[in-house]
């Protein structure tokens, strides 16, 4: 078959605060679509609230984290053939240094994150998780 390259624009991100001492980790993807009342501006505002929560969690823990996220906007039409993600406007990409830190972060988020307010995007509820090994270290 033909090799196909799918490229994305990274429109928004939160960098890691510290480098992961051991390569590899866990990545997760949420695939989301904008709605009539939730567009790119609302996404940036929602990420601002998420960043505030992350800052408070890091401060409470007293240690920096290698967790980071990026918002990937496809430079191609979705869905792609054979994809289970369906059609989407952006992929919310998370990186954790381990499954343990991902599970701890998810539990903390479930317990302490502010409830969503106002319009929300249409997202696939299932988080697509993969083991990861970076080709290069993210810049800090």
Question: Where are the predicted features?
Answer:
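Short S/T/G/P-rich N-terminal loop/turn motif that feeds into the first structured element of a domain
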Residues: 1-140
């Amino acid at each position: 078959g033909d090799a196909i390259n799918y490229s994305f624009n990274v429109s928004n991100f939160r960098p890691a605060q510290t480098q992961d001492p051991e390569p590899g980790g866990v990545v997760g993807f949420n695939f989301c679509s904008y709605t009539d009342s939730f567009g790119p501006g609302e996404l940036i505002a929602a990420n601002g609230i998420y960043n505030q929560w992350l800052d408070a969690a890091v401060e409470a823990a007293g240690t920096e984290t290698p967790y980071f996220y990026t918002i990937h906007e496809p430079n191609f039409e979705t869905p792609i053939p054979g994809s289970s993600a369906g059609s989407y406007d952006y992929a919310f990409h998370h990186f954790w240094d381990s499954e343990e830190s991902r599970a701890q972060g998810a539990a903390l988020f479930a317990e302490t994150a502010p409830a969503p307010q106002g319009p929300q995007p249409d997202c696939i509820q299932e988080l697509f998780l993969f083991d990861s090994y970076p080709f290069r270290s993210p810049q800090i």
